[in-house]
């Protein structure tokens, strides 16, 4: 009888000891899920851009964003992901996580309306990234650089990159420049510091 009571006692102690571990595991899974964003529609992409530019992704180096379909942005006014710099070249908000394009294409992206509004601004699908990884993304579209401002960085994938990696991405942009000075206006990235392209 004593052995039976002792056995039950130890079984209860073991069960109680496992409860915090189960709760911790659930919290960990919840945290991992909450930092992942899946994009399947144009509206979801536009919302993601707005969230980054509003500061919702500030400091989220563990953020994972996955593009799950090709998206056509015909008729949409595009604001680069990663806020425009002010005239002192300060960037209020930017993306620092992982963006997986998964081989998908963003098409008919028109950067023309955004270009030239602020001097020293960085333009692209992403405006500015830091400690980020962008992969498997194709951007198709156009830009007509007619603004009066100069010295802007333009890249189809990202305008300016710092301490980041851009991997397996494709730029397919038609470009018209009306007497403005731009860095990197032909390729993936306008300006890069401590960044890797693969």
Predicted regions and their residues:
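C-terminal segment of classical bacterial N-terminal signal peptides
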Residues: 15-24
């Amino acid at each position: 009888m004593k052995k039976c009571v002792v056995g039950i006692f130890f079984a209860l102690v073991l069960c109680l000891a496992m409860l915090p571990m189960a709760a911790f595991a659930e919290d960990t899974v919840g945290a991992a899920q909450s930092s992942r964003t899946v994009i399947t529609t144009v509206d979801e992409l536009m919302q993601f851009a707005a969230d980054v530019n509003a500061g919702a992704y500030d400091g989220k180096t563990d953020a994972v964003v996955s593009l799950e379909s090709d998206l056509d942005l015909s008729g949409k006014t595009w604001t680069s992901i990663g806020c425009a710099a002010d005239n002192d070249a300060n960037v209020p908000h930017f993306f620092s996580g992982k963006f997986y394009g998964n081989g998908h294409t963003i098409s008919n992206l028109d950067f023309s309306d955004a270009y030239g509004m602020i001097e020293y601004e960085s333009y692209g699908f992403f405006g500015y990234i830091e400690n980020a990884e962008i992969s498997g993304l194709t951007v198709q579209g156009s830009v007509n650089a007619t603004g009066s401002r100069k010295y802007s960085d333009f890249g189809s994938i990202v305008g300016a990159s710092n301490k980041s990696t851009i991997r397996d991405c494709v730029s397919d942009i038609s470009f018209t420049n009306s007497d403005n000075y731009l860095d990197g206006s032909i390729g993936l990235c306008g300006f890069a510091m401590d960044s890797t392209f693969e």
